[in-house]
Amino acid sequence: MKIALIDVDGHNFPNLPLMKLSTWHKKHGDNVDWYEPLTAWYEPPDIVYMSKVFTFTPDYPHPINARKIIKGGTGYFYPNGGNPLNEDVEHCYPDYSLYPELCKNTAYGFFN
């Protein structure tokens, strides 16, 4: 399967749910990459995951071509955040390779 990710808030800090979804899909043999709006029109992904943390962040401005679009996060579903990740996805080690510049020689701690 072809999986695409959209970090709606931008790439200024790692998005933990997208990182965990990336790990889970890669473990299952899927191809995971950032969503590219131009190439998606001739090779649409099977699933696009969109994650948004902040309610003040504008939504993704471009049309999305995919078989399935899944939105999540407090930015979309304040205050409860919407549906939680599946347990097996939640317990995956995050895929820090999605943010090579932000995660170079850096460790992030997430608390909830």
Spans of features found by a protein language model:
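N-terminal [4Fe-4S]-dependent radical SAM core
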Residues: 1, 74-112
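A short, structured N-terminal alpha-helical element that caps or precedes a catalytic domain
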Residues: 1-81
